[in-house]
From Swiss-Prot:
Name listed for the protein in its UniProt record: Glutamate--tRNA ligase
Annotated coiled-coil segments of the chain: none
Gene name of the record: gltX
Top-level taxonomy: Bacteria, Pseudomonadati, Pseudomonadota, Alphaproteobacteria, Hyphomicrobiales
Residue window of motif 'HIGH' region: 11-21
Assembly behavior: Monomer.
Catalytic activity of the protein: tRNA(Glu) + L-glutamate + ATP = L-glutamyl-tRNA(Glu) + AMP + diphosphate
UniProt KW keywords: Aminoacyl-tRNA synthetase, ATP-binding, Cytoplasm, Ligase, Nucleotide-binding, Protein biosynthesis
GO molecular function, one term: zinc ion binding
Function, as annotated: Catalyzes the attachment of glutamate to tRNA(Glu) in a two-step reaction: glutamate is first activated by ATP to form Glu-AMP and then transferred to the acceptor end of tRNA(Glu).
Amino acid sequence: MTSPIVTRFAPSPTGFLHIGGARTALFNWLYARGRCGKMLLRIEDTDRERSTTAAIDAILDGLKWLELDWDGEVIYQYSRAARHREVAEQLLASGMAYRCYATAEELAAMREKARAEGRTRLYDGMWRDRDPKDAPGDVKPTIRLRAPLTGETVIEDQVQGRVVWQNENLDDLVLLRGDGNPTYMLAVVVDDHDMGVTHVIRGDDHLINAARQKQIYDALGWTVPSMSHIPLIHGPDGSKLSKRHGALGVDAYRAMGYLPSALRNYLVRLGWSHGDQEIFSTEEMIKAFDLPAIGRSAARFDFAKLENLNGHYIRHSDDAALVRQFEDVLNYVPNGATLKAKLNDATRAQLTQAMPSLKERAKTLLELIDGAAFLFADRPLPIDAKAAALLTPDSRALIGRLHDALAAVEPWSGPATEAALRAFAETNNLKLGAVAQPLRAALTGRTTSPGIFDVLAILGRDESLGRLKDQTTS
């Protein structure tokens, strides 16, 4: 019987949940969910100076927004420091670790000498076999792993393949600092072991850590989890991802109007492929995702592709669900509170009614908000430059006549106003476009909007006639 799959997402709370971290969380989540396993969440807060509560909150909020749930309670690494120290002492007792009394000055000299000689092994092992009786009384020792000096450390990585390090190039790494605090390397191994993690899926910037951590596993006689080191995300030109290219927090993507479903779909295709398929439902992702299908080369972030994908998701979203997304994003955009204050049962109903037309033109929720601005505008309506150019004196006179024609429509509806406008155009020997364009400018303050008959129906009689009256000349 095989043991259940357990993955983990283990961010450090020193900043926001960046896009690379979000993809790592997604890959862990998909792998676990597709195999009836668990994904655990561990906050690696051992760096007390840089870890912040605000960063922890941002990570949790980002995961919740992406709808990536975890199993069990959040584990905080620092709270397990006593257990980490216990394991360090265990290694010390077994002879697989030793106390090192090297001073900061001695260590600096070792590093300088090693670099001058072109060696990657920086620590010279001065306390590896030295009698502890020689220990200076004024130095608080670290505990170092007694790493093998010869042979190889090998990882069979599910993404990178077989990766080999020569042990002569790897240091006796520090497990416990002089102040008694465990290092990241030790804490990760102990936590993964104690939590039953079977699969470690993380960025390939951690690949060198895998070698060091395997040596700790071997020293303890513990089973090494399956390792998968996924390629990093680069900018579209292949350079390191920058803020200009998309190296932003998940919260920034929410504020830019991206849907969590679209961002998940985009992220899963950054480095992973399943034939030529580009669009995946969550269920399809869970079913199809596997580690060997992840490529080794860096994925390239493309804002235009994300935007187009987001537009697809907006167009195919349920209208009521989009209204909820619309309202939610107002909490994260400038002047969102002003617009949110105008949302009530009546305006929500108008927004829902307009959504089939609005969503066809929008690639982000911000574009959706912009397209819906005419619904929430106060009278007299602000008119943009392009619309103002249409509202010539002749057009305003025409609007006055249109006002009178529409005032006679009863009952008010899209089909009824359409019939009235077509009759007006025919009677006055005008093309419908010559009527619709100034009418749109007067009703929405823009030159683009949902269909003009839809606009009239959504605004209703009183608001439509009032806006036309505002733009009429005597």
